């Protein structure tokens, strides 16, 4: 290996990063340099990532992101590169269930008759079959994590090419992933599950996506704005000039004038109409620009249906 001269580079610090890859430990040396990273160029000498100008309103959910900009509107799944991520998520679940079955078969003394784990100190034994499955599960999780990060970077670069002012709501993933505290019974007298959005947040990384977006815009000379909590983009109806609370299941809903809109996209449109002076929704901008962006939204939804793209929790039905 040839030595690399670092005399002309200011080195900030060095980090040793151990990783388990395909069952073997590997140690990587991370060199962190001072200053800003140089821009990337393609093989033709052009900038690899373009920086756009304009406003982008984005509604970041637990599994999807909807955005409205001066050039295009969009709605897509978070942290997804093709359809392979859904297959990988399913394989993670299958491996985890296989590990649980093996653990129960090897350690029956640690479980109650109803299947719950006994309290107190326990000694666990793991079979060779369990260890092999665990290694496969760990390797699959590692690959999925890398693919998620690559997908996040690709989406962040695309959004930066649409504009230089990014407007969104504050992060709330840490609150959504917590289990519900209240015990509620449904109409049949059964307990409602206390699980919320932990699995979706783990698979789609909305907070990681938002952090990457914030860093991307601020480092590249853009602006990142989080609206105040009283903004309530998901409840406002500009045709009625009122805040109307909706059910979580209402993904497609009708405005007061009878227009059907996709909920996430409409929230991104209201974020696009943010008034930086009053820190509130610019109602005049909503009225003047809604028809133009509504036509773009309808065209985009038709494109999703024609290409049979499954957008999670969007309410868009694919034949």
Question: What name fits each language-model region?
Answer:
Residues 1-23, 199, 203:
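Acidic carboxylate diad motif detector
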Residues 27-319:
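Positively charged, helix-rich recognition surfaces that bind polyanionic ligands
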């Amino acid at each position: 290996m040839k030595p690399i001269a670092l005399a002309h580079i200011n080195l900030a610090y060095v980090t040793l990063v151990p990783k388990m890859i395909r069952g073997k430990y590997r140690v990587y040396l991370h060199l962190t340099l001072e200053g800003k990273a140089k821009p990337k160029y393609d093989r033709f000498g052009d900038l690899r990532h373009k920086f756009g100008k304009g406003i982008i309103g984005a509604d970041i959910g637990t599994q999807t992101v909807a955005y409205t900009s001066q050039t295009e509107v969009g709605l897509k799944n978070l942290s997804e590169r093709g359809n392979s991520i859904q297959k990988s998520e399913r394989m993670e679940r299958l491996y985890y269930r296989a590990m649980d079955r093996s653990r129960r078969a090897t350690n029956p003394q640690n479980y109650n008759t109803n299947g719950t784990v006994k309290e107190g100190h326990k000694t666990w034994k793991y079979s060779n079959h369990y260890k092999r499955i665990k290694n496969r599960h760990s390797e699959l999780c590692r690959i999925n994590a890398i693919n998620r990060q690559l997908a996040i970077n690709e989406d962040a670069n695309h959004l930066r090419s649409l504009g230089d002012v990014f407007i969104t709501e504050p992060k709330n993933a840490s609150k959504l992933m917590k289990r519900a505290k209240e015990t509620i019974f449904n109409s049949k007298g059964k307990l409602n599950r206390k699980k919320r959005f932990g699995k979706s947040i783990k698979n789609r990384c909305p907070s990681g996506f938002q952090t990457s977006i914030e860093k991307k815009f601020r480092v590249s000379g853009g602006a990142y704005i989080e609206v105040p909590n009283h903004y309530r983009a998901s409840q406002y109806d500009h045709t009625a000039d009122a805040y109307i609370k909706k059910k979580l299941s209402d993904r497609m809903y009708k405005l007061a004038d009878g227009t059907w809109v996709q909920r996430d996209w409409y929230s991104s449109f209201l974020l696009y109409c943010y008034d930086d002076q009053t820190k509130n929704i610019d109602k005049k901008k909503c009225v003047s620009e809604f028809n133009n962006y509504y036509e773009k939204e309808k065209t985009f939804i038709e494109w999703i249906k024609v290409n049979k793209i499954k957008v999670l929790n969007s309410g868009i039905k694919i034949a």
